[in-house]
UniProtKB/Swiss-Prot annotation:
GO CC, alphabetical: cytosol
Sequence positions that bind Mg(2+) 2: 226-227
Pathway: Amino-acid biosynthesis; L-tryptophan biosynthesis; L-tryptophan from chorismate: step 2/5
Protein name in the entry: Anthranilate phosphoribosyltransferase
Originating organism: Methylobacterium sp. (strain 4-46)
Binding locations of anthranilate 1: 81, 112
One annotated GO biological process: L-tryptophan biosynthetic process
Cofactor annotation remark: Binds 2 magnesium ions per monomer.
Lineage: Bacteria, Pseudomonadati, Pseudomonadota, Alphaproteobacteria, Hyphomicrobiales
Record function comment: Catalyzes the transfer of the phosphoribosyl group of 5-phosphorylribose-1-pyrophosphate (PRPP) to anthranilate to yield N-(5'-phosphoribosyl)-anthranilate (PRA).
Superkingdom of the source species: Bacteria
Residues involved in 5-phospho-alpha-D-ribose 1-diphosphate binding: 81, 84-85, 89, 91-94, 109-117, 121
Quaternary structure and partners: Homodimer.
Keywords assigned by UniProt, alphabetized: Amino-acid biosynthesis, Aromatic amino acid biosynthesis, Glycosyltransferase, Magnesium, Metal-binding, Transferase, Tryptophan biosynthesis
Length: 337
């Protein structure tokens, strides 16, 4: 496609695109107007140089314009990771989302099937009995009646089909791996976002600020997890009231024991679903600890708790009272109605 060639030529020199140029270039990519050779060369040029903030904002804008949107209550948040940490861990953000919803904060969770693990959010939720691929009206009902919905990425970003073959052929991370967490179909203004590389934390936080987010914690565990980990400290880049600050979370400071990486390693969706149900039924496991830690952080991001310790305590209470188990039961029932 001739109109795409100027953008390809510019990135080939190592120069960065402006926000507007990136938006237009990704409009072409997502419209299916670009050959596989052009798309692959373009994406790899960005990858090798490193994507600039304005390029990520422009790309996200192009994808957001095309996504199927969902109406969510005010104050809804997302708990999501970029994936790609190759940890094979349990479905931490999924369980944390259930706990957060049980504490009264609506969670519009956006996710997909496994990319680098054996069980992604979609995989474990399906194993738990949640129906995937609901239309926007069905998702809105889930939010209203269960306080939680799962927006299956492939049902909301049909334009991604144009670049799917290229991504498979490249077989490596590209900018598209980052766009999912930046393009929540419910337009949430608050996020707990995990990243597979610490170097991404501040740039993606600034991108979300540019895209209109109001409160964000972007986290990267010292063990490489795209979650707040319990094996050691976690670095946090927080967007709060228009300002960005950096701090570290140590699970021991909120009364949680350190875990080993093996403690957090999951398996297939059925195994992870059974482990999740066990936590909701009261099992005190390392999976429980990391889930209440992440849910506690989400409650702070949502403004429902003043501090992490309070958030962790509320998340734990949601398990003990059965409120979290009830959220999952309602989500299964409403999604299958």
């Amino acid at each position: 496609m001739d109109s795409f060639k100027p953008y390809l030529a510019k990135v080939a020199t190592g120069a960065a695109l402006t926000r507007e140029e990136a938006r237009t270039a990704f409009d072409h990519l997502l419209s299916g107007e670009v050959t596989h050779a052009q798309a692959g060369a373009f994406l790899m040029a960005l990858r090798v140089r490193g994507e600039a903030q304005d390029e990520i904002v422009g790309a996200a804008g192009a994808l957001r314009e095309r996504m199927v949107r969902v109406v969510a209550p005010a104050g809804a948040i997302d708990i999501v990771g970029t994936g790609g940490d190759h940890s094979g861990s349990y479905n931490v953000s999924t369980l944390a989302s259930i706990l957060t919803a049980a504490c009264g904060v609506p969670v519009a969770k956006h996710g997909n099937r496994a990319a680098s693990s054996r069980s992604g959010a979609a995989d474990v939720l399906a194993a738990l009995g949640v129906r995937l691929g609901l239309d926007p009206e069905g998702l809105a009902r889930c939010l209203e009646e269960a306080g939680l919905c799962f927006m299956f990425a492939q049902a909301h970003h049909a334009s991604m089909r144009h670049v799917a073959p290229v991504r498979v052929e490249l077989g490596t991370r590209t900018l598209f791996n980052l766009l999912g967490p930046l393009c929540n179909p419910a337009g949430v203004a608050g996020q707990l976002l995990g990243v597979y590389a610490g170097s991404l934390a501040e740039p993606l936080t600034r991108v979300l600020a540019d895209l209109g987010s109001r409160r964000v914690w972007t986290v990267h565990g010292s063990d490489g997890l795209d979650e707040i980990t319990t094996t050691g400290p976690t670095a946090v880049v927080a967007l709060e009231d228009g300002a960005i600050r950096h701090f570290t979370i140590d699970p021991r400071e909120v009364g949680l024991a350190l875990a080993s990486p093996e403690d957090l390693r999951g398996a297939d969706p059925e195994h992870n679903a059974a482990a999740l149900r066990a936590v909701l039924d009261g099992a005190r496991t390392p999976y429980r600890d990391i889930a209440v830690l992440n849910a506690g952080a989400a409650l702070v991001v949502a403004g429902a708790c003043a501090g992490l310790g309070e958030g962790v305590a509320r998340a734990a209470q949601a398990i003990e009272t059965g409120a979290a188990r009830a959220v999952l039961a309602r989500l299964v029932a409403v999604s299958n109605a």
